[in-house]
């Protein structure tokens, strides 16, 4: 029963609205009855432990695009205001439009100065909201690239995986993303996972252990200085969006 409760809480906590018109009626900040979410962790996570990558996930810099085996996957660098750095390999073969969207936002400076506004130790850290409270976004949405929305996405929500937050509507993701602090396989097929942390697990752990209030908001702002994505000369173009 505890696991079922935790799953329901987790799904609600990840929901947020990001600016496209159809999502506006489903804004979630703090849902009633889930203030104890931090007491429902997805699993224990040792501070220095780095997870095994699922078979579907390539190693850093390894391309999985059949068309050109010489092309490297893009690498995102999240630099925190306090100097901490996290690097993630993005998988355009797994969630192509989601990756395009993240690259476009990051390299335009959209994420610069934003925060991780929702933090749950043993579950995930969530950021990328210009409103800072789970209700903001880039004034558009993108199609949800995950199994329950008719898209084959084999990437499992293991510790270190980055995925897109959304409202209960499947095509409502915009700019908000979350990074798993612990394994959360129960999210598989429901959210668009699109990359994996390759460096900076100690930074992830530090952020996840931030003191938070009853709404899982950090007591002190956890500020992103910049997010930039190295594409190694590959042009990904702009994402397909829903307005």
Give residue ranges: language-model regions:
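Positively charged n-region of N-terminal signal peptides that target proteins for export
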Residues: 1-4
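Cyclophilin-like peptidyl-prolyl cis-trans isomerases
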Residues: 8, 16-243
């Amino acid at each position: 029963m505890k696991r079922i409760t935790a799953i329901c809480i987790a799904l609600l906590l990840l929901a947020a609205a990001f600016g496209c018109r159809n999502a506006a009626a489903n804004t979630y900040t703090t849902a009633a009855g889930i203030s104890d979410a931090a007491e429902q962790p997805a699993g224990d996570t040792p501070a220095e432990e780095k997870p095994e990558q699922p078979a579907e996930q390539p190693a850093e810099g390894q391309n999985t695009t059949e068309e050109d085996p010489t092309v490297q996957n893009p690498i995102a660098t999240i630099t925190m205001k306090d100097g901490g750095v996290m690097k993630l390999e993005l998988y355009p073969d797994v969630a192509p439009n989601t990756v395009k969207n993240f690259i476009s936002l990051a390299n335009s400076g959209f994420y610069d100065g934003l925060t991780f506004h929702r933090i749950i130790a043993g579950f995930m850290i969530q950021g990328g909201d210009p409103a800072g409270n789970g209700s903001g976004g880039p004034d558009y949405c993108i199609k949800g690239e995950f199994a329950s929305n008719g898209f084959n996405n084999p990437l499992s929500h293991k510790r270190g995986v980055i995925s897109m937050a959304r409202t209960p509507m499947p095509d409502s993701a915009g700019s908000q993303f979350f990074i798993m602090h612990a394994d959360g396989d129960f999210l598989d097929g429901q959210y668009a996972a699109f990359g994996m942390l390759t460096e900076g697990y100690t930074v992830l752990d530090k952020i996840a252990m931030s003191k938070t209030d009853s709404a899982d908001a950090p007591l002190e702002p956890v500020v992103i200085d910049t997010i930039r994505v190295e594409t190694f000369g590959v042009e990904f173009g702009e994402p397909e969006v829903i307005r």
